[in-house]
From Swiss-Prot:
InterPro entries: NADH_DH_suC, NADH_quin_OxRdtase_su_C/D-like, NADH_UbQ_OxRdtase_30kDa_su, NADH_UbQ_OxRdtase_CS. NDH is composed of at least 16 different subunits, 5 of which are encoded in the nucleus. PROSITE patterns: COMPLEX1_30K. It is a peripheral membrane protein. GO terms for molecular function: NADH dehydrogenase (ubiquinone) activity; quinone binding. It holds the Pfam family Complex1_30kDa. It catalyses: a plastoquinone + NADH + (n+1) H(+)(in) = a plastoquinol + NAD(+) + n H(+)(out); a plastoquinone + NADPH + (n+1) H(+)(in) = a plastoquinol + NADP(+) + n H(+)(out). This is NAD(P)H-quinone oxidoreductase subunit J, chloroplastic. One of its GO terms (biological process) is photosynthesis, light reaction. The gene is ndhJ.
């Protein structure tokens, strides 16, 4: 079964993979990193003008990294929002995904957190730098293959 956005993307020849619906009935799509920016723009034009949240996770040790976007479209009133979940998978060695900051400003801190914790580089993000960890921190703490240091010093903690 296809959702509205998936059917619209198929109708216009845009490559994606439907992952079905979650337990709340939200359509979930998989998009390739190289197709993500154009599909994000199209989604915005189609009416998904609110990025509810963005997060990222490590699929498996040595596996892919995923960036997840929940988009909301309010067409018939705030009590009937239409939502879609889009997952963009990137290779672990050099994870690059186009930033959607220029489409949805709310992606700013969320993409920075995903970069800081998992090392996903969001291309064309205006301020992509660590947001939670010190700039001197080595590694990506939420990766499943991350080895925590035996000792680290917290400086200037008051």
């Amino acid at each position: 079964m296809q959702g509205r956005l998936s059917a619209w993307l198929v109708k216009h020849g845009l490559v994606h993979r439907s992952l079905g619906f979650d337990y709340q009935g939200i359509e979930t799509l998989q998009i390739k990193p190289e197709d993500w920016y154009s599909i994000a723009v199209i989604s915005y034009v189609y009416g998904y003008n609110y990025l509810r949240f963005q997060c990222a996770y490590d699929v498996a040790p040595g596996g892919l990294l995923a960036s997840v976007y929940y988009l909301t479209r309010i067409q018939y009133g705030v009590d009937q929002p239409e939502e879609v979940c889009i997952k963009v998978f990137a290779p672990r060695r050099n994870p690059k995904i186009p930033s959607v900051f220029w489409i949805w400003k709310s992606a700013d801190f969320q993409e920075r957190e995903s970069y800081d914790m998992l090392g996903i580089s969001y291309e064309n993000h205006p301020r992509l730098k660590r947001i939670l960890m010190p700039e001197s921190w080595i590694g990506w703490p939420l990766r499943k293959d991350y080895i925590a240091p035996n000792f680290y010093e917290i400086q200037d903690a008051h």
